[in-house]
Regions:
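Amphipathic, small/basic residue-rich leader segments at the start of a protein or domain
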Residues: 1-92, 115, 119, 156, ...
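Glycine-rich phosphate/cofactor-binding loops in nucleotide/flavin-utilizing enzymes
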Residues: 2-5, 74, 78-79, 99, ...
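Glycine-rich beta->alpha junctions and the first turn(s) of the following alpha-helix
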Residues: 6-10, 206-299, 368, 384
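C-terminal helix-coil-helix/basic helical segment that borders enzyme active sites and/or dimer interfaces
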Residues: 31-39, 275, 279, 283-286, ...
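Internal helix-loop-helix
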Residues: 53-114, 118-123, 171-177, 296, ...
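A short, Trp-centered hydrophobic/proline-enriched beta-strand micro-motif
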Residues: 123-131, 181
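A short core secondary-structure module
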Residues: 143, 159, 163-208
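Intrinsically disordered, low-complexity terminal tails and inter-domain linkers enriched
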Residues: 149-159
Length: 391
């Protein structure tokens, strides 16, 4: 059996201390996360991202020529953990940093890199992801949005016209750009049907409508695309190569969301708040608490394995395994905290236990089972990897 030792480097503790000081000094108590639609919270995320960028921390592991900090993937892992442990004060910027930027670095043209990467690294632009559809959430290869050729006699002179609908599009109401998947080759095999486009959200034909949800703040949307013009310079990678790039990007996304760190933080913070009351908790609760911490350690190690395999064909399945473990822990911790606090777990505001973070976490834990692909699909991806059935 191979033993894996994930060394975050000698400077990990120093980096954590630096990040925690920045958060303590610039993020107000009671801030609850990436999906806020509160104007004051959005202003906090915007100013905090600009501060991180000025410190060379926002895109810590990006190459310096693209505006990054030139750090290691393990330094970036520490950054992710500290951000999620403090309810992701980067707000909607995490999407651009975690996977949109890396996808453009890997597959973009020189012009696309010059246009987009420095702006993402500076925290100046919000991106959204136009993948899921009403009839294609889990099986993205079956999406129905079409990019029809717009030949020499069309309005573009060359390119496509995109028509269709997207759902569950986070941040579309505030995004400046969208990574949009559309079918350009309907007669090709499924993996070769799709193309990714980098589309400005102010392009004619795009309509965004909010989707109310149990998550509370408005961050989910549906997008309607009515003959949206797309040009050759908008294509990320090659036409027909969208499915491969999407799978790679989704692996980055799953690893980039370090929710296990948020769960650990909630447990440790509540243990501190309980003080002497900890000893009066039923033994069954304390046993569950310890088991939750052990399971979170497993989720963390699975995430580290996925990070270590970023350039490996097994990266997608490793990311799925990490996401499965984290999602299970999300719900396990949410239920445990509710059992400890009872009705007080529903309180919100700065006077509530953990400033209301427990109720907020419970709602997001329910949604985590379907976000970025259902947990059942993640298990299927892991099974294919174990059986050697790569597709």
């Amino acid at each position: 059996m191979t033993t894996m030792d994930y060394d975050l480097g000698d400077d990990a503790a120093e980096l954590r201390t630096r990040l925690r000081q920045l958060i303590a000094n610039h993020v107000p108590a009671g801030f609850l996360g990436a999906c806020t639609d509160d104007p004051q919270d959005l202003a906090t995320t915007e100013s905090f991202c600009k501060l991180l960028a000025a410190e060379g921390l926002l895109a810590l592991a990006w190459p310096k020529e693209h505006g990054g900090g030139g750090g290691s993937i393990w330094q970036q892992t520490v950054l992710r953990e500290e951000m999620w442990a403090h309810h992701e004060p980067r707000g909607p910027q995490y999407m651009g940093i975690n996977w949109v930027g890396p996808a453009i670095m890997r597959h973009g043209t020189a012009a696309q890199k010059a246009k987009h990467l420095s702006a993402i690294a500076a925290g100046e632009v919000v991106w959204c992801q136009g993948f899921s559809e009403p009839e294609a959430g889990t099986d993205l290869a079956s999406l129905r949005t079409r990019a029809l050729p717009d030949g020499p006699n069309g309005p573009n002179g060359t390119g496509w016209r995109i028509t269709g609908q997207k759902v569950w599009t986070s941040y579309a109401q505030m995004a400046s750009w969208c990574v949009l998947a559309a079918c350009t080759h309907p007669d090709a095999p499924k993996p070769k049907r799709l193309t990714l486009f980098l589309i400005p959200m102010d392009r004619p034909g795009i309509t965004v409508r909010p989707i109310p949800s149990m998550l509370g703040p408005h961050h989910l949307n549906e997008m309607f695309l009515d003959g949206v013009p797309a040009f050759p310079g908008d294509v990320l990678g090659e036409p027909g190569d969208g499915w491969r790039i999407m799978r790679e990007a989704l692996a980055f996304e799953r690893v980039g969301i370090a929710r296990y760190a948020r769960c650990e933080s909630l447990l440790h913070r509540l243990r501190t708040e309980l003080g002497d009351d900890w000893d009066r908790l039923p033994e069954s609760i304390r046993i569950r608490w310890v088991r939750a911490l052990v399971d979170l350690r497993v989720a963390r190690l699975l995430a580290y394995r996925a990070v270590s395999l970023q350039e490996d064909p097994r990266a997608g399945a490793a990311a799925s395994a990490a996401r499965i473990a984290t999602t299970i822990c999300d719900q396990q911790v949410a239920e445990l905290l509710f059992d400890v606090l009872g009705p007080a777990a529903l309180d919100s505001g700065v006077t509530a236990p953990l400033h209301g973070a427990i109720e907020d976490h419970w709602r997001y834990a329910q949604a985590a089972t379907v976000a970025s692909g259902t947990i059942e699909v993640q298990r299927m991806l892991v099974a294919r990897d174990v059986l050697g059935e790569h597709r």
